Amino acid sequence: LTRKTWAFFENLIGPDDNWLPPDNYQENPEPRIAHRTSPTNIGLSLLSSLAAHDFGYLTTLQLLDRSQKTLSTMQELERYKGHFLNWYHTQTLLPLYPRYVSTVDSGNLAASLLTFKEGILSLYTLPVLRDDLYKGLTDTIAVLREKTKEPGAFQKIIEDHQEIGTTASVRLSSAKTFLEKLLPAAEAFLDKQKTIGTTESIWWAETLVKQCSNASFELTTLTGWMQDVDQHPKLSEVFRMPVHIPSLNDLMNMTDVLLPRLEKTILNEQGPEEKEWMIELESRIRNARLMAAEMIESIDTLAKQCIELADYQYDFLFDPAQHFFSIGYNVEDHRRDPGCYDLLGSEARLGVYVAIAQGKIPQESWFALGRQLTNTGK
């Protein structure tokens, strides 16, 4: 179910809609995408990407790339006192009229942005590929089996490497072998589906290949050099590689220590072939370090953008006498709605909570929300 749910976001959020989520997709009587979106939708799409990463459907690099595109688009959208407007056209990026600020939408988006920020910051210290890699790929395989009526597809590969999905700290060699076996098998399965499959089965087969390819690329680029260092007699003497997949911070620390030692070893190396091999290895390590540094920079940028985009002015929505938020604000008429959210059970409570946490409104506002009780008859 989670894999199929992510497929909606994966398939419909892309360049055609400026990496914003369409409000809905109509299947009948004819397929149609609603090219409009709201702040709540945008926040949900960011959290869906974060969840997809947690489930192993997206690599860290993919998560950062998709999120950066969405946040960059958000910075282009018209806002009012920091608030995103109620609706935008996802292709023109223009607001839909009448322009309106919804208290509920603003609260939902702010909460999503701040939650997303915390999730992104955790990527510094998480392994670049975790046990979720295995679980995410097996989820996709399960859907593919369902769509193709081939329950035994990839069974041997999955069984041979099931330890990857049962340990929190994945061995680098295990992940590498798993992907080396699964990718060609997935490509062969896709070729078969292109001949005998349906549109849906072909899409899922292509998705499996992409998942494998993206995971393999990230693992190879960031860590592919580690086994070469560990297996080389001269290098392994001066630097012992960890057997488990490192985090981005680990990679930066490891290469900080290793590169100066490797440079010294290269200078002292007399054999031309060995020296050439070490120079090529040094290049791969520098590429890995550069990629890790760029990913860390992207995390920093995304976190800062989230803080900035969740920073609203609340004075025009908030009634300080009652400690209540108005339902919203009509930007066209410069008019605050007279109705207020006065119940804890209302959909505005998340916005109230976030605004208090940001220090924008007093804590008394939380306790001002009504908490009516009723007799259940029990």
Predicted regions and their residues:
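Acidic, mature catalytic/reactive cores of soluble proteins
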Residues: 1-378
